[in-house]
Amino acid sequence: MTTLASDAPIAAVIGGSGFVGRYVTQALAKRGWRVRVGCRRPNEALFVKPYGVVGQVEPVLCNVRDDDSIAAIAEGADCVIYSVGILFATGKNTFAAVQAEGPARAAKAAKAAGVERFVLISAIGADAESPVAYAKTKAEGEAAVLAEYPEAVILRPSIVFGPEDQFFNRFAGMARFSPVIPVVGGSTKFQPVWVQDVAEATAKAAMGEAAAGIYELGGPGVYSFKELMEMMLKVIRRKRRVFDIPIPIGRLQGKVMQLLPNPPLTEDQVKMLANDNVVSEGAKGFADLGIEPEAPEGIIESYLVRFRPKGQYTDMIEAARSRQS
C-alpha cells in the first residue's frame, strides 16, 4: 500500500509500542487503518512509524493513569484497543493501576467519545477470586470494560512468544552462561501462542469480524514448562540441565528477588506457576476467528539462533568441520 484512503478507519492502540501492541499496530496498518500508538514516551516509539505510509502510524502520548491523555487518544477513533500489562509492579504502576483501572479509564473514555468497538487483550487465568494480583486485576479490567461495552471483544492469550518475548529470550540468554536452567513448577502446562496470531485475532476484532465475548488463545500444542526449556535448548544447541524448583521454595526465592529493581522472579509469578495456563474446555478461541495458530517449533529458531555457541554461523562452522573429518 502506497497511499492511505482519506476515510481510513482510526484505531487507538494503547500500549501499541509494546511487545504485543507493535504487532497489532502492524496488522492494522497493513489493513489500511490509521493507527494512534498510545505510549508514555512517544520519542522512544518512533520505530512504529515505518509500519505504514507517511502519517499512517503515529506515536501519541498516553498514560493509562491519566484520564485526559486517554480521552485525547480515543477522540474520533473507530476502535480502541487496550494492550497494556505488567508482570511486576513498579512505583505507581501497580497491577491495579495498569490492569484494572487502566482498562476502566479507557473504556469510559471510548464510550464518551462514541467509539464503536473496544478490544481488550487480557490473559488466560484472569479470575476475580484469584489470590494472584496479576490474575485478579486482569479480571477486574475485563469486568470494567464489559460494564461500558457489553459487546466488547476480550482476548486471553496463553504465554506469548515472538522475537521480543521475555520468555524464550530470557532463558536462552541464561543458558549462555549458566550450566543449569532453574524453573519453578517444571510440570506446569502452557499453550504458547505466536504474537502474530494474537495480532491477527485483535485485528479481526477491531474490524468487527469477531462476535462479542471472551476468547482464549492458545497455540496448537500443550507443553510443560520443562518441555519448553528443552525445546529452547535444542534450538540453541546447548546442553544444560533443567532443574525443577518446588513451588514452596520458589515462593521464598520470589519474596527475596521481588525486592530487586527488575526482578527475574516474584512471589506473585510463582503463585501463577502453580496453575496450568491452557485454554479452558469449551472456550471460544482461534477456531471461532478462522485462524489456524502456529506452533513454536517452527518459529523460535528464527530469533533464538543468536544464542547458539557461534550464533548464526553455527551451521556453517559445523558443516565445514564435517567436510574436513
Predicted regions located by residue number:
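N-terminal Rossmann NAD(P)H-binding glycine-rich loop of SDR-like oxidoreductase domains
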Residues: L4-W33
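Mid/C-terminal beta-alpha module of Rossmann-like enzyme folds, strongest
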Residues: T2-A5, A201-D268, S280-S325
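Conserved glycine-rich Rossmann-like NAD(P)H-binding loop of the short-chain dehydrogenase/reductase
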Residues: W33-N43
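Residues forming the Rossmann-fold NAD(P)(H) cofactor-binding site
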Residues: G21-Y23, A100, A139
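Conserved beta-loop-beta element that borders a ligand/cofactor-binding pocket
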Residues: S122, E142-Q166, G173
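Substrate-positioning beta->alpha
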Residues: R105, Q166-F167, G185-M207, A212-E216
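NAD(P)H-binding glycine-rich loop region in Rossmannoid oxidoreductase-like domains
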Residues: P42-R105, A109-A112, I124-A128
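SDR active-site strand-loop-helix element
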Residues: I14, G38, S83-V84, F118-I124, ...
